[in-house]
Swiss-Prot record:
HAMAP family: Ribosomal_uL2_B. One of its GO terms (biological process) is cytoplasmic translation. This is Large ribosomal subunit protein uL2. It comes from Shewanella frigidimarina (strain NCIMB 400). The gene is rplB. InterPro entries: NA-bd_OB-fold (IPR012340), Rib_uL2_dom2 (IPR014722), Ribosomal_uL2 (IPR002171), Ribosomal_uL2_bac/org-type (IPR005880), Ribosomal_uL2_C (IPR022669), Ribosomal_uL2_CS (IPR022671), Ribosomal_uL2_dom3 (IPR014726), Ribosomal_uL2_RNA-bd_dom (IPR022666). Coiled coil: none annotated. Pfam families: Ribosomal_L2, Ribosomal_L2_C.
Length: 274
């Protein structure tokens, strides 16, 4: 993995910082694990914008990634690592002994030819998956389920990981990167190690167009809008907005707590660090 700062041969190249991984597959992805991906432009079925700053971008296929890791007892081998445009992490194409291929998240240090396995008897080794009840306390894991059999939801992005800090009865306690301590059922699965491509955070796109290639549209400041569009809009000349910062719908944006899910409050042992 190399971090390359581009020479300023043009204004668009001046600030570009690339992260280059020579171990990634240079050919096409495995066709049997691709799905069609239709762009919405941030609109719902009525045609109204429900997600701002979304639209355009290069056409992409979705890679079907195995987040459940439920193929127990069958050894597999990593065939190759691939780039995935749909996520910050890289993915690994694995070939099982019975001939099936699946994509999984590429863990830190994973390379082509590595053996992996999932199940109760899987070795304690990066890339192997086990239920939390069979993972030693203190282990660093990623791709953690929140409900048994649902598929991984926690620690899936580049460089992410959580630590198993305790196990009591039907629940294991995890320490998340944010500092939050959360309980998860011990029958949920997790994968040993960290997610790879941690250098992703060092990347700099360098120009607005690179964001547009990724389907991200510009963000307009509220004070630059009209009063009909935003609470900060309007006024003669430049203004400060005239009030504490709020969203277009009037919700305070600076540190205001918006979490309201009492059903799952009991699973949070400690809120995240501020």
């Amino acid at each position: 993995m190399a971090v390359i700062k581009c020479k300023p041969t043009s204004p668009g190249r001046r600030h570009v910082v690339k992260v280059v991984n020579t171990d990634l597959h240079k050919g096409k992805p495995f066709a049997g694990l691709l799905a069609k991906k239709t762009k919405s432009g941030g609109r719902n079925n009525t045609g109204r914008i429900t997600v701002r700053h979304v639209g355009g971008g290069h056409k992409q296929h979705y890679r079907i990634v195995d987040f459940k890791r439920n193929k127990d007892g069958i050894p597999a081998k990593v065939e190759r690592l691939e780039y995935d445009p749909n996520r910050t992490a890289h993915i690994a194409l694995v070939l099982y002994a019975d001939g099936e291929r699946r994509y999984i998240l590429a863990a830190k240090g994973m390379k082509a030819g590595d053996p992996i396995q999932s199940g109760l008897d899987a070795e304690i080794k990066t890339g192997n998956a086990r239920p939390l009840r069979n993972i030693p306390v203190g282990s660093v894991v990623h791709a953690v389920e929140m409900k048994p059999g649902k598929g991984a939801q926690i620690a899936r992005s580049a460089g992410a990981y959580v630590q198993v800090v305790a196990r009591d009865g039907a629940y294991a306690t995890l320490r998340l990167r944010s500092g939050e301590m959360r309980k998860v059922p011990v029958d949920c699965r997790a994968t040993f190690g960290e997610v790879g491509n941690a250098e992703h955070m060092l990347r700099q796109l360098g120009k607005a167009g690179a964001k547009r290639w990724r389907g991200v549209r510009p963000t307009v400041r509220g004070v630059a809008m009209n009063p009909v569009d935003h609470p900060h809009g309007g006024g003669e000349g430049r203004t400060s907005g005239g009030r504490h910062p709020v969203s277009p719908w009037g919700v305070p944006t600076k540190g205001y707590k918006t979490r309201s899910n009492k059903r799952t409050d009991k699973y949070i042992v400690r809120r995240r660090n501020k």
